[in-house]
Amino acid sequence: MDLRALIGVIEIPDLKKFLPEFILLLLAFILFTLELFIKGKERRLVLNVVSYVGYFSVLMSLLIPWMYKGDTFYGNFTNDPLAVTVKIFAVLITLAILPFASSYFSAKKSFYGEFYYILAFTLLGVFVLASTYNLIILYVALELVSVGFYILTALLRGSTEAKEGAFKYLILGGLSIALASYGAAFMYIYSGSLDLREILTYQGKDIHYLVLGLVFFLIGLAVKIGAVPFHYWVPDAYQGAPTPVTALMASVGKLAFFIPLVRVMPLVQEKFSLVWTITVGVIAALTMLYGNLVALVQKDVKRLLAYSSIAHSGYIMAGAAVAKVIGMKAVIYFLVAYAVMSAGAFLVLALMEKNPEWQNYMENFYGLRFNAPYIAFAFFVYMVALLGVPPTVGFVGKALVFMALSFDKLWWLAFIMILSAAISTGYYIRLVVVMYMHEREKEIRSAPSHLGEKFSLFALTLASVLLGVLPSLVWFLIKQSAENLFTG
């Protein structure tokens, strides 16, 4: 064969569209090499500095205008507005978490250099997951993110809780990947394609293969996002993991694992609109109610926030039940909102846990405003935001979901959402009350926080309020992301 003719039919990928991913991959290998060869006290400093430089470089590359345009790699990799929005917020939240991770492990009198390069590889998986419709690439990205979280959950080697949480996460996470792969196989049998867009628009006769494949695929995703009844790994993994890792899983992890579900939404409205609404709506209702009811009886605040995370998966799924533009706008906004709120809430716990006397039990929060006033205020903001009190970002998120449900006349699901939010008042307000209206039972002061931690906490607290007062700051990205998916 004429080599020139062969080259003529080969599409050369537009490599500049992979720039953020290339930077992340390079960062991961640099951190891996540095961790191997640099010893002594300077290792922590070098890994931190290189990480900050790398993530800021990734962020800058995402702000270049051409990142928003078109597909590449034979249509298997897309840099549409949704992908870029997810990547920007994933990097920003990772940068907010990074200062806490270093000081947290230092306070535990241990240093895990592998945290830095595993974090970079995990974020690379998030980026790829946000940018593909191809089932094989989706599988690889899901595995990359999942394996990263399995390892990070078990990072505290001396902790039995960490090992137990990581083991449960590994077993159920492996099951979810298997189910999603099984579903992908059925979808391929139906359509002969690995592209979700082609699969769900294909007019084939054996539609039962498509239905079966879609069911298995969605069950696999439901495990990842912690939806009921596939949520069993969430409380133990969140409680056992190092708290900065928990913040990462609750924010960036949830943001990433919801993206395949978001990309499927416009594709199901023609063939499966009613079935989709009922199925996703029922799972959302169960998830909202269960998460909030079980959170009511928790004494450990970290575990309470884990059940709150389950409940918020339900709120987001309620928006996803409306497979229309208005539903997608609500879902994307709520994902961003929850990422900000949950990261902040867990990072407050990470800050308190630096004190060896601190335990995350409710009684230790009594009179926290006396011991750590600015930390108590930040935690207060996150609690009212998670509850959905105006003018916080959580209120806007829940209002958008309620509007989407009302638009689609899903009054039964809207009622369950309001009921669930009312139930959640019990534990969010209880935390606020014990911090501000009870005297301290014993003096447990927070460990000193450095400038990076203070800035991150300030930024997340400000964002929790500012994005509620001025949602227009991010609305352009969210509106463009949703409308682009429905109009192509």
Curated annotation (Swiss-Prot):
UniProt key word Translocase: yes
Highest taxon listed in the record's lineage: Bacteria
Catalysed transformations (reactions): a quinone + NADH + 5 H(+)(in) = a quinol + NAD(+) + 4 H(+)(out)
Keyword Membrane: yes
Transmembrane segments: 18-38, 45-65, 81-101, 110-130, 135-155, 169-189, 210-230, 242-262, 274-294, 308-328, 331-351, 375-395, 412-434, 458-478
InterPro entries linked to this entry: NADH-Q_OxRdtase_suN/2 (IPR010096), ND/Mrp_TM (IPR001750)
Keywords, ordered alphabetically: Cell inner membrane, Cell membrane, Membrane, NAD, Quinone, Translocase, Transmembrane, Transmembrane helix, Transport, Ubiquinone
Annotated GO CC locations: plasma membrane
Cross-referenced Pfam families: Proton_antipo_M
GO BP annotations listed: ATP synthesis coupled electron transport
Membrane-topology descriptor: Multi-pass membrane protein
EC number: 7.1.1.-
GO molecular function: NADH dehydrogenase (ubiquinone) activity; NADH:ubiquinone reductase (non-electrogenic) activity; quinone binding
Subcellular location(s) per record: Cell inner membrane
The protein's role, per its UniProt record: NDH-1 shuttles electrons from NADH, via FMN and iron-sulfur (Fe-S) centers, to quinones in the respiratory chain. The immediate electron acceptor for the enzyme in this species is believed to be ubiquinone. Couples the redox reaction to proton translocation (for every two electrons transferred, four hydrogen ions are translocated across the cytoplasmic membrane), and thus conserves the redox energy in a proton gradient.
Family note: Belongs to the complex I subunit 2 family.
Assembly notes: NDH-1 is composed of 14 different subunits. Subunits NuoA, H, J, K, L, M, N constitute the membrane sector of the complex.
Entry protein name: NADH-quinone oxidoreductase subunit N 2
Organism encoding this protein: Aquifex aeolicus (strain VF5)
Lineage summary: Bacteria, Pseudomonadati, Aquificota, Aquificia, Aquificales
